[in-house]
Amino acid sequence: STVLLFSSILLMLKNNLNNEINESFTSMIIMSALLLKSGAAPFHFWFPNMMEGLTWMNALMLMTWQKIAPLMLISYLNIKYLLLISVILSVIIGAIGGLNQTSLRKLMAFSSINHLGWMLSSLMFSESIWLIYFFFYSFLSFVLTFMFNIFKLFHLNQLFSWFVNSKILKFTLFMNFLSLGGLPPFLGFLPKWLVIQQLTLCNQYFLLTLMMMSTLITLFFYLRICYSAFMMNYFENNWIMKMNMISNNTNMYLIMTFFSIFGLFMISLFYFMF
């Protein structure tokens, strides 16, 4: 925030200093400060550690709401070469950083960095697609963090013993993981599909290939979690939590999961009907 404020003051004083201040350099500093504030690579180092110390609802705010203002300001600056570097680093670090994580909050943090790379890439070439992507990402993140918050889930080993006798709820949780990863035909694939179309129209094939490969890595560790949780039963870990299922919260979660899984079909049906 201090860097952002200082750079803004320099930019305002530019005319009074007989143009001795390089405007592009000042804009680059402002852009770097905004990328730092949004948690994009290579300024992401604070983000996973901050996420680890927050409650799930506060973590959700950090992953979604706190990114709106920086992204809006970045869309006005749009220094493409700096954005391109941040996009490449964000999708790579967001994918690789989540591979060996056992903390769900850090896993969601690196997933957020990866998704932020997709948003920044769409922001480079379109003023509206990144908003659509942000909306769907916020919804899918809310569905997962809502369930994590209800059952106080913070580590992967808790998922292995979670709902041993309730396979349906466990199944819906991992479908939401795959939807967040952008696997078709779930709802999370729709914003990625829009970004892919936009980058294809702009002939950004190298960037698009790199982003899709990073998404495959994120899907790999999501699928690894799903496989481990379904194929193995850790009955000795059942002491981790006593499940007091609040029916209203569970019903709300299942409704949101329905939209997460079948949302793409519903939107496609609505599109072809009207």
Swiss-Prot record:
Cellular compartment(s): Mitochondrion inner membrane
Ranges that cross the membrane: 28-48, 54-74, 79-99, 107-127, 128-148, 171-191, 206-226, 254-274
Gene Ontology MF: a single term: NADH dehydrogenase (ubiquinone) activity
Family: Belongs to the complex I subunit 2 family.
PANTHER family: NADH-UBIQUINONE OXIDOREDUCTASE CHAIN 2
Name used for this protein in its record: NADH-ubiquinone oxidoreductase chain 2
Higher taxonomy: Eukaryota, Metazoa, Ecdysozoa, Arthropoda, Hexapoda
Pfam families: NADH_dehy_S2_C, Proton_antipo_M
Its EC number(s): 7.1.1.2
InterPro entries (UniProt xref): Complex_I_Subunit_2 (IPR050175), NADH_DH_su2_C (IPR010933), NADH_UbQ_OxRdtase_chain2 (IPR003917), ND/Mrp_TM (IPR001750)
Top-level taxon in the UniProt lineage: Eukaryota
Gene name per UniProt: mt:ND2
Key words of the record: Electron transport, Membrane, Mitochondrion, Mitochondrion inner membrane, NAD, Respiratory chain, Translocase, Transmembrane, Transmembrane helix, Transport, Ubiquinone
Topology term for the membrane: Multi-pass membrane protein
Function: Core subunit of the mitochondrial membrane respiratory chain NADH dehydrogenase (Complex I) that is believed to belong to the minimal assembly required for catalysis. Complex I functions in the transfer of electrons from NADH to the respiratory chain. The immediate electron acceptor for the enzyme is believed to be ubiquinone.
GO biological process, any: mitochondrial electron transport, NADH to ubiquinone
One GO CC annotation: mitochondrial inner membrane
Species per Swiss-Prot/TrEMBL record: Drosophila sechellia (Fruit fly)
Protein's UniProt keywords contain Membrane: yes
